[in-house]
Regions:
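RNA-binding accessory domains that recognize and position tRNA/RNA substrates
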Residues: 5-200, 205-220
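Short glycine/threonine-rich loop/turn motifs
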Residues: 226-228
Length: 228
């Protein structure tokens, strides 16, 4: 571990024992989570705010991430759900007319730990072969301590994250007053799904928490029910 850290400042350690050295960016700290990968060339802002990535460490396989910054339009929810971000190269100076801040700044603000300088293609092949597994991004250089932290960290399987991703109260999204009314059970629903239903299909949406009682939905008397 000491030799691996010689020219870098943090490591990514996988549950299977694989070690990758890199450079920290975003929030300064340590993060444990389930590692998953995404092959999209763009859309990192949508991915970070997608409730389906709750408590996961996301690996982006595209070589450069952050080149168009962060804007006010592309969030898929009201929160940043990913716990960590792994990239080959973090673009420090984004260029886009809609950009409001850099990826680095956004991660700091939302307490998301990032690591760059990683061979992301190699890492993706490992995950593809071995499946999702626990990982840690850390500046710790004691391998024994790292292994203990990984071992103690709970597995994602069977962990109910729905209540952490759902909305707190019922709210309405108006489409066309002449169109049908749909009740949406929010199990971590993305904003874009609601946007398409209301703007493209003109549906009137009533979005409720995942534990909304059936009796409450019956009072609303919707034309349809969507589980999302």
């Amino acid at each position: 571990i000491f030799s691996i850290l010689m020219d870098t400042d943090c490591i990514l350690y996988l549950e299977n024992g694989e070690v990758f050295s890199g450079f920290s960016f975003g929030f300064e700290g340590e993060v444990l989570g389930e590692i998953v990968f995404n092959t999209s060339m763009t859309g990192y802002q949508e991915i970070l705010t997608d409730p389906s990535y709750h408590s996961q460490v996301v690996l982006m396989t595209y070589p450069q991430i952050g080149n168009y910054g962060i804007n006010n339009e592309d969030n898929e929810s009201g929160s940043c759900y990913a716990k960590g971000l792994i990239v080959r190269e973090n673009c420090k100076y984004p260029s886009n007319f809609e950009s409001k801040e850099s990826l680095d700044s956004y991660l700091k603000k939302n307490k998301v730990v990032g690591i760059s300088g990683i061979d992301t293609r190699k890492l993706a092949r490992i995950i593809r072969g071995d499946g999702a597994q626990k990982c840690i991004i850390t500046k710790e250089n004691n391998l024994k301590k790292i292994k203990e932290k990984i071992k103690k960290f709970p597995v994602m399987k069977g962990n109910d994250l729905t209540f952490k991703a759902t909305c707190k109260d019922i709210y309405n999204i108006l489409g066309d007053k002449n169109e049908k009314k749909v009740f949406v059970y929010d199990f971590g629903c993305k904003h874009n799904i609601l946007k398409i239903l209301s703007e493209k299909f003109k549906l009137n949406l009533i979005v409720g928490p995942c534990d909304t009682p059936p009796e409450e939905v019956k009072k609303i008397n919707p034309d349809g029910i969507l589980l999302s």
